[in-house]
């Protein structure tokens, strides 16, 4: 997909996605033989449920058909969310990941796995899990020190409600 087509699609679709209360996170056109697939990734601070995705999918489909932005050939439109282990690339992604465990690749080359506690314009306050029975520690991390960041899936984490109930018992 040329940059021009990508920019045109983003300009066309972003206001429509925004009007549905969602953020346009990504657009990808993939061609395999004669088949083309347009993948649109959406999200919001509250997450996007299936009804919201279906609504935005119908709106995008109508707009694309109306404008012929994908050209004459057939294509498949896929609309979805970023997934559980999403890469964090925008400030809003970090805000959405508060209380989540994240793997950071630092610009100095080190790797860090920590939970995001708070986010501000300059960086993050993190809780670094303790090693070998030690208590967790807090750490400040500036955005400029982050090369890459990706949310980690946790299968057995207690949520805040469970932790509060244990503390009260």
From Swiss-Prot:
Pfam families in UniProt: DUF150_C (PF17384), RimP_N (PF02576)
Principal location class: cytoplasm
Alphabetical UniProt keywords: Cytoplasm, Ribosome biogenesis
Gene3D superfamilies: RimP-like superfamily, N-terminal
GO terms, biological process: ribosomal small subunit assembly; translation
Recorded GO CC terms: cytosol
Residues that span the membrane, as ranges: none
Primary role: Required for maturation of 30S ribosomal subunits.
Family: Belongs to the RimP family.
Protein's name in the database: Ribosome maturation factor RimP
Organism classification: Bacteria, Bacillati, Actinomycetota, Actinomycetes, Kitasatosporales
Name of encoding gene: rimP
